[in-house]
From Swiss-Prot:
Keywords: Ribonucleoprotein, Ribosomal protein. Coiled coil: none annotated. One of its GO terms (cellular component) is cytosolic large ribosomal subunit. The gene is rplM. This protein is one of the early assembly proteins of the 50S ribosomal subunit, although it is not seen to bind rRNA by itself. It is important during the early stages of 50S assembly. GO terms for biological process: negative regulation of translation; translation. It comes from the Bacteria. This is Large ribosomal subunit protein uL13. Gene3D superfamilies: Ribosomal protein L13. One of its GO terms (molecular function) is structural constituent of ribosome. It comes from Prochlorococcus marinus (strain MIT 9301). Belongs to the universal ribosomal protein uL13 family.
């Protein structure tokens, strides 16, 4: 009978991938990123271990949404104080902090526990085409 092999933390190999968000649809891009962050693209995927890779996203300000979402999609946040609800449209958030749009979309697709928070830390999102991770030799992710 075959035994299921659980990878140890020492044997997990982490690669660096580069994703260009230019002219990509937000949700479709986020699902591919979340899959790589979780490690579901690897044969050694284990649900309770962080087997995923690092992902660098560039050109975050050029990500697209379909339909009227650019003018109608709302992002809500709350300061925790009474009356502290802030609501912002996709367009204004894309001008102000485009990295947050991709981060929030991917974060919602990861597990909502300590493992998901650990996997989310391996996501690096940048406005523009430059990133400080050239030393890691990131491989372009086919998407």
């Amino acid at each position: 009978m075959n035994k299921t092999i659980t990878p140890s933390l020492e044997t997990i190999e982490r690669n660096w991938f580069l994703v260009d968000a230019k002219d990509k649809t937000l949700g479709r891009l986020a699902t591919e990123i979340a899959t790589v962050l979780r490690g579901k693209n690897k044969p050694t995927f284990t649900p309770h271990l962080d087997t995923g890779d690092f992902v660098i996203v560039v050109n975050a300000e050029k990500v697209e949404v379909t339909g009227k979402k650019a003018s109608q999609k709302l992002y809500r946040r709350h300061s925790g104080r009474p009356g502290g609800m802030k609501i912002e449209k996709f367009e204004s958030l894309q001008e102000r902090i485009p990295e947050r749009i991709i981060e929030q979309a991917v974060k919602g697709m990861l597990p909502h526990n300590s493992l998901g928070r650990q996997q989310f830390k391996k996501l690096k999102v940048y406005k523009g085409a430059d990133h400080p991770h050239a030393a890691q030799n990131p491989v372009l992710l086919n998407s």
